[in-house]
């Protein structure tokens, strides 16, 4: 029998004001009172300084690092500065947590994930998106040892991030369809449990679409729970298949082509509309659901020129070529790409 290790967070703490418990969480989980706290320039003010204050009151020795970008250089810096720490605390958005995730994996120390936004499922997943000289790559990493998601803080972030997180979860639907296709056509390993969890999470969020609003803590809580669940599906699968398919290829292509890309989740949401059309699914419902939460559904709403949308569709199949999707091995012709974007009203 084939056995595989599934990494999941040991503890998940989510709720209003839960960040105040971070000292107790660290005391219960960590062998020593010395940690590296990684933040971003903005997130340090939002939550990082408060985490530092709480842990200093609990007599922790703290090494502070601020990063601007999720690059290989940032990871190397954090690896060097955290090698003697008992854990890394990533306090911030996706870039901060991705760098913290890779550094903790390399140093074989736990990561405590403290997200300040609900923009994508990186807060709980065993994957990290890191930029190198070839672009952005998705790397395997250890899942966070613990996760502390303060919904008060997350709900105060710009609503655009929460809507992007919602969109990222909805993209699970096309991702799983792509995964099924790869299983049928090229016999790629498929996990029924991971796929079921991923799809269930997306459907639960669709059911909650009417209740997702700006500056609303319950809305933030719903999206956070969905992102955590999506991250767990990735852990169960052992790869990002349950949450990343042709729609993510489109988003990554846009990142490479567009001068000013939108948020990852926003691009994946628009990609989901078009890929659902290709898959023969109910793309109109996807579009309607995203509109309910005020997430972008068009090139104009993404703030990206229509030509870049077309070019990203044409180039998308070249992203992670080993990952088979509805785009196939040869991708889309320009005529097909234009037709898909027009039919789904992503372009006019």
Curated annotation (Swiss-Prot):
Q: Which residues bind Zn(2+)?
A: 168, 248, 264
Return the EC number: 1.1.1.261
- Which pathway does this chain act in? Membrane lipid metabolism; glycerophospholipid metabolism
One MF annotation (Gene Ontology) recorded for this entry: glycerol-1-phosphate dehydrogenase (NADP+) activity
Q: Which GO terms describe its cellular component?
A: cytoplasm
What is the reaction catalyzed? Answer: sn-glycerol 1-phosphate + NAD(+) = dihydroxyacetone phosphate + NADH + H(+); sn-glycerol 1-phosphate + NADP(+) = dihydroxyacetone phosphate + NADPH + H(+)
Q: Which residues bind NAD(+)?
A: 94-98, 116, 125
Top-level EC class? oxidoreductase
Q: How is the cofactor bound?
A: Binds 1 zinc ion per subunit.
Instruction: Provide this UniProt record's keywords sorted from A to Z.
Output: Cytoplasm, Lipid biosynthesis, Lipid metabolism, Metal-binding, NAD, NADP, Oxidoreductase, Phospholipid biosynthesis, Phospholipid metabolism, Zinc
Protein localization: Cytoplasm
Signal sequence coordinates: none
* InterPro entries (alphabetical): G1P_dehydrogenase_arc (IPR023002), G1PDH (IPR032837), Glycerol_DH (IPR016205)
Q: Does the keyword Ribosomal protein apply?
A: no
- UniProt-listed NCBIfam families: PRK00843.1 (NF002022)
Summarizing the function annotation, the protein's role is: Catalyzes the NAD(P)H-dependent reduction of dihydroxyacetonephosphate (DHAP or glycerone phosphate) to glycerol 1-phosphate (G1P). The G1P thus generated is used as the glycerophosphate backbone of phospholipids in the cellular membranes of Archaea.
**What is the protein name for this chain?**
Glycerol-1-phosphate dehydrogenase [NAD(P)+]
């Amino acid at each position: 029998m084939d056995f595989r290790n599934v990494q999941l967070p040991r503890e998940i703490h989510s709720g209003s004001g839960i960040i105040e418990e971070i000292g107790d969480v660290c005391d219960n989980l960590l062998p020593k009172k010395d940690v590296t706290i990684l933040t971003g320039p903005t997130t340090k003010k939002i939550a990082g300084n408060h985490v530092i204050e709480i842990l200093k009151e609990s007599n922790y020795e703290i090494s502070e690092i601020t990063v601007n970008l999720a690059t290989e250089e940032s990871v190397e810096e954090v690896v060097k500065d955290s090698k003697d720490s008992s854990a890394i605390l990533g306090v911030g958005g996706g870039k901060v947590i991705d760098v913290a995730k890779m550094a903790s994996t390399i140093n074989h120390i736990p990561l405590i994930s403290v997200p300040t936004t609900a923009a994508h499922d990186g807060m709980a997943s065993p994957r990290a998106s890191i930029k190198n000289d070839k672009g952005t790559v998705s790397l395997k990493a250890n899942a966070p040892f613990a996760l502390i998601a303060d919904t008060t803080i997350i709900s105060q972030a710009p609503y655009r991030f929460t809507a992007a997180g919602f969109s990222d979860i909805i993209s699970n639907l096309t991702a799983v369809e792509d995964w099924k296709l790869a299983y049928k056509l090229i016999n790629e390993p498929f996990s029924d449990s991971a796929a079921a969890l991923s799809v269930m999470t997306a459907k639960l969020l669709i059911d909650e679409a009417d209740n997702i609003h700006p500056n609303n803590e319950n809305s933030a809580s719903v999206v956070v729970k969905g992102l955590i669940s999506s991250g767990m599906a990735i852990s169960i699968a052992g790869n990002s298949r349950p949450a990343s398919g042709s729609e993510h290829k489109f988003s990554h292509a846009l990142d490479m082509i567009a001068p000013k890309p939108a948020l990852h989740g926003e691009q994946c949401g628009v990609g989901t509309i078009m890929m659902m059309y290709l898959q023969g699914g109910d793309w109109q419902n996807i579009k309607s659901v995203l509109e309910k939460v005020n997430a972008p559904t068009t090139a104009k709403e993404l703030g990206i020129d229509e030509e870049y949308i077309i070019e990203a569709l044409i180039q998308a199949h070249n992203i992670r070529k080993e990952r088979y999707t509805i785009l196939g091995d040869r991708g889309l012709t320009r005529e097909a790409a234009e037709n898909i974007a027009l039919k789904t009203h992503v372009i006019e």
